[in-house]
Structure formats: structure tokens, C-alpha cells
């Protein structure tokens, strides 16, 4: 049972996000009468709150060297958020709830990965756990739309509450096992080993950290751009049925899981920055292919490149940040925030790219150029890596 706790927790946190993220706009419109403009503002404020929470809560956990306790609080806040959103009818109150309650509640998955790193988990373990989160994202959005379609908008809030209860239970059991280990160590007169994650010296200098963070913001932005514009691009530029956009995104999500597992295995033998460089090359090829694709067969085939590109960003990126920044909570929070900032940057990418003579195809050419820029930045950052330490994580727990 104990071995199933971390995978179960990863699946539940993934389901929570996969249920809420695609359904939130519908909830705001149908339950609170929000206009499109209001939805944009609310989501922006909500993401800003999440950005701050992703820094403060993990930093507090670092200070206490305790990640499961705050993770339990995040589960309780998720349950409270679902209850509040189902009860209120005012958009301003719902917005306040999303910022004050939803922001911290969304940090739970970050704390799980920080807990793993604090306990000395290997890069392979972390990437495999991240693959489980991707499994949740394969099933979560379709299941969420099914629940809303058959049972109404408030039903998805009930589903989120149910997931939160399971999350609370799983985390409580993890805390019980941890406390039992501490008591057993005290009874034997032994001291728990110092967490490797907090004892390591960063193999990357401050300049390297800044460069890699900048590169990841670009990579996250291009990935978010492709996901955001795919449906519109397929229908308006390729003149295909909208179902092909859904098929393409579904195939990409399904391929992410084996890609993450494969890149996790490779991380034990190859440089992390080198693997990320291969994902950048795949991303450049993917965006160039999208810019010139004309039919559904190539559109679907290109998702293999998309999956490998994402595996580098999501799979290797997380343990790389945890290695660069010895504090597990802060490093994980900063990594998660590169996605939030990247999502913000994706808006200008879409606006700028669509103004070119190529129309929407120009968006993907812009993405290819930005990914190439990210690759160059990573190559420069690699030169700042300390030769004595390398740029990969230990392969053992």
C-alpha cells in the first residue's frame, strides 16, 4: 500500500487540475454570468494569485522542512473552494475565492514533487511521477466535459470536492507513515539522514539559473501557444473539422506518457541540458511542420515531435530546477511559475505572429524562432555549469 501512495497522490492532484482548468471558464459564464472580458480578467487575477502562492507556500515548507503538512492544507482548501464556488452566485465573491482559496490550493502538486526531492528521490522517480500527472490530463478534460454535459456545471464542482477528499485521505496516510518512520528512528537512537536535495551545492551559477529560467519561459510560452491556438488554426486555416484538433491534442497527450518515461530513463545516463536541447530541436521541427501542414495525416504525425518536446520541458525541466536550486519547495515553485509566465507571454505571441503575411501560420514560425532562441540560451547556460559536478542528478535515491 505504501508504494502506491505517491502515484495515487500524483494522479489525484493531476485530476484536480485537469477537472478545474478546462471547466473554469464555463463555470464563470454559466454560474455567475461572466462576459468574455470578465472571464479574461478573472482568470488573469486567479493566475496572479497562484503565482504568488507558488512562491510563498513552498518557501514556508522549505523553512519547516515539511511538505506533507502544507500539502494536506492544499487538499482542504480545494474542498473548501469547491463548496464556496457551488454556493455563491456573485462573480466578485467567486473571484475572491479563486484568489484567496484557489491560489494556495493549486500548489499541492508542487509540494508533492518538493517532498519527493526532499526525500532524495532520483530524477527517474520524479519524471515517472510527472508521467502519472500526464495520465490524469489525458482522462481529466474529457471526463470533466462529460460530467458537465450530463449533470450540469455544479456537478464538476462536486467531482472536484470528491477528488479533494481522496487527496486529503492519501496525504494523511503519507503523514502517518512519515511520523511512524520518525518514531522508529528515535526509538533506535538513529538520526534521519540529511536530505540530499538540501545538502547539494548548485552545479549552475546564478547567471546560469537566470538564463535557464528565461529559456524555460520561452519554451513554456511556445507550448502554451500551440495548445491555445490549435482549435482555431485547424478550423480557420486548415479548414478541417474541429474534431481533428481534438484528435491532435488527444494523440499528443497520449504520447506524452511514454515520452516522459523514456526521457526519465535516459536522464540517468545523459546530461539533463543535453536532453532538453533534443526536445528544443523536436519543438522547432514541430512548429515548422505546423506552419506548413495542409492535411490531417501530417497534423497527427507531428504530435510525436510535440510529445518529445513537452517531455523535455515537463519531465527533465522539473528535476533540473530542483538540482539548480537546492531548496526543493522554492525550486519546484519557480519551475511551475515558468508555465504561468509562459501562458501570459503566449498572448503576445499569438497577436504578433498572426499579423505577419502568413496569418496564423506565422504564429508557429514565431514559436519556432523563440524555441531556437531558447535552445541558444540553454547552450550558453551549459557553459556556466561547474565541470566537477556535471549537470545531471544522481541516479539513485
Task: Explain the meaning of each model-derived region.
Residues 326-356:
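A late C-terminal transmembrane helix in Major Facilitator Superfamily
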Residues 35, 146-164, 352-371:
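A membrane-interface helix-boundary motif in multi-pass transporters
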Residues 99-133:
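Cytoplasmic helix-loop-helix junction between adjacent transmembrane helices
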Residues 1-47, 215, 223-234, 245:
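Helix-loop boundary and gating motifs at the non-cytosolic
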Residues 69-83, 274-289:
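Structural signature of the two symmetry-related core transmembrane helices
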Residues 106-120, 311-326:
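Intracellular juxtamembrane helix-capping segments at the cytosolic ends
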Residues 53-66, 148, 259-271, 354-355:
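Helix-to-loop junctions at the C-terminal end of transmembrane segments
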Residues 11, 92-108, 217, 298-312:
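Hydrophobic core of transmembrane alpha-helices in multi-pass small-molecule transporters
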Amino acid at each position: 500500500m505504501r508504494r502506491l501512495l505517491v502515484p495515487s497522490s500524483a494522479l489525484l492532484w493531476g485530476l484536480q487540475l485537469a477537472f478545474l482548468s478546462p471547466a473554469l471558464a464555463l463555470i464563470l459564464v454559466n454560474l455567475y454570468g461572466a462576459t468574455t472580458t470578465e472571464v479574461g480578467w478573472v482568470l488573469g487575477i486567479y493566475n496572479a494569485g497562484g503565482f504568488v502562492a507558488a512562491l510563498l507556500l513552498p518557501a514556508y515548507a522549505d523553512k519547516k522542512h515539511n511538505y506533507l503538512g502544507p500539502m494536506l492544507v492544499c487538499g482542504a482548501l480545494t474542498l473548501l473552494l469547491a463548496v464556496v464556488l457551488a454556493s455563491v452566485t456573485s462573480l466578485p465573491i467567486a473571484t475572491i475565492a479563486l484568489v484567496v482559496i484557489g491560489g494556495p490550493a493549486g500548489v499541492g502538486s508542487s509540494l508533492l514533487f518538493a517532498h519527493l526531492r526532499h526525500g532524495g528521490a532520483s530524477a527517474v522517480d520524479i519524471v515517472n511521477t510527472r508521467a502519472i500527472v500526464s495520465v490524469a490530463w489525458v482522462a481529466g478534460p474529457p471526463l470533466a466535459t462529460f460530467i458537465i454535459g450530463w449533470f450540469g456545471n455544479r456537478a464538476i464542482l462536486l467531482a472536484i470536492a470528491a477528488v479533494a477528499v481522496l487527496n486529503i485521505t492519501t496525504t494523511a496516510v503519507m503523514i502517518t507513515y512519515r511520523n511512524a518512520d520518525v518514531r522508529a528512528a528515535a526509538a533506535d537512537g538513529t538520526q534521519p539522514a540529511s536530505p540530499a536535495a538540501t545538502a547539494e551545492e548548485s552545479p549552475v551559477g546564478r547567471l546560469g539559473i537566470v538564463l535557464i529560467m528565461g529559456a524555460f519561459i520561452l519554451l513554456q510560452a511556445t507550448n502554451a501557444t500551440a495548445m491555445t491556438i490549435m482549435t482555431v488554426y485547424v478550423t480557420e486555416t486548415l479548414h478541417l473539422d474541429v474534431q481533428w484538433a481534438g484528435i491532435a491534442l488527444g494523440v499528443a497527450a497520449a504520447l506524452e506518457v511514454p515520452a516522459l518515461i523514456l526521457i526519465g530513463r535516459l536522464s540517468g545516463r545523459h546530461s539533463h541540458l543535453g536532453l532538453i536541447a533534443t526536445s528544443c530541436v523536436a519543438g522547432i521541427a514541430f512548429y515548422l511542420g505546423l506552419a506548413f501542414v495542409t492535411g490531417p495525416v501530417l497534423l497527427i504525425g507531428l504530435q510525436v515531435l510535440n510529445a518529445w518536446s513537452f517531455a523535455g520541458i515537463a519531465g527533465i525541466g522539473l528535476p533540473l530546477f530542483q538540482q539548480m536550486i537546492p531548496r526543493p519547495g522554492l525550486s519546484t515553485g519557480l519551475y511551475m511559475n515558468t508555465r504561468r509566465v509562459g501562458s501570459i507571454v503566449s498572448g503576445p505571441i499569438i497577436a504578433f505572429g498572426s499579423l505577419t503575411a502568413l496569418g496564423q501560420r506565422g504564429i508557429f514560425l514565431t514559436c519556432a524562432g523563440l524555441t531556437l532562441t531558447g535552445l541558444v540560451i540553454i547552450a550558453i547556460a551549459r557553459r556556466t555549469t561547474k565541470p566537477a559536478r556535471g549537470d545531471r542528478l544522481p541516479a539513485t535515491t
